């Protein structure tokens, strides 16, 4: 057993994978909403969502492969998920933004046990 599974239970890995997939979908939907509103692709909000979606995808692959780097990707998801949740909540103007904030916070909480596992 490598990476996150060394110190984390299988259920924690499964939760982190599920939360990563859900957050990836939410971030991609958020990017589409911003694009539809005319926000430029190089805008900070769009870049943050793109980074989060890409990192979520990488995290899922690392955890599924039991990669040595999976603890690092989970750590980055914890960190970036917290940033996305905060940004989405502070700038929330609609239910979709609140849902994005919820999904990103769920990602951070789901990945946290893998980051701080012994």
Predicted regions span which residues?
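Amphipathic alpha-helical hairpins
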Residues: 1-118
């Amino acid at each position: 057993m490598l990476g996150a599974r060394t110190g984390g239970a299988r259920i924690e890995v499964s939760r982190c994978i599920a939360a990563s997939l859900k957050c990836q979908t939410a971030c991609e939907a958020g990017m589409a909403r911003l694009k539809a509103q005319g926000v430029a692709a190089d805008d900070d909000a769009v870049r943050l969502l793109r980074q989060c979606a890409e990192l979520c995808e990488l995290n899922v692959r690392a955890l599924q492969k039991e990669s040595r780097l999976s603890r690092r990707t989970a750590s980055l998801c914890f960190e970036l998920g917290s940033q996305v949740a905060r940004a989405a909540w502070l700038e929330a103007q609609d239910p979709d933004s609140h849902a994005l904030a919820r999904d990103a916070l769920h990602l951070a909480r789901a990945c946290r046990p893998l980051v701080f596992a012994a």
